[in-house]
Amino acid sequence: MQYILERAKSVLEEFGGRDVFETAENAGVNVWFRTLGSLKGFYIFENNCRYIVINEELDDITKGVVCAHELGHDMLHRKLSVGGIRENTLFLANNKTEREANLFASEILIPDDDILSALSECDSVKRLSAQLGFPSELIQYKLEAMNFKGYHFKLSDVKNDFLK
């Protein structure tokens, strides 16, 4: 967990702020929008080029979450994707990588202070989700990351595959 949090922090500091699309581009990752049917997105590393492909039919919030998640795969699991293996075939078999990418995404997209501020008005993950505009599963990952940092939030089980 420590490595994921440190990696997310360094990515934000080195490549940009909370605009995940700009951050990805600044990090040298090409972000493309395509029609992908039921697939929300995938990451690919091929011929020393890095790509995040996002379903153009998603709403803007989901596009951002998918981009942050796939950027997590780039920053944490790049070597697992060598040779053009796409997320829908590689990462479904390994929940650890999905969990790590989701934790990374939560750190990239949601500042701790936003959670702490929203808690003055919200008493549940569902309400935090509505207040902050992110999926409740991503909020859960953020709370888990904050617990690792020393906060004490009650957590329920989180699905690794909420972006599938």
Label every PLM stretch briefly:
Residues M1-K164:
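Active-site hotspot residues in diverse enzymes, especially metal/ion-binding acidic/histidine motifs
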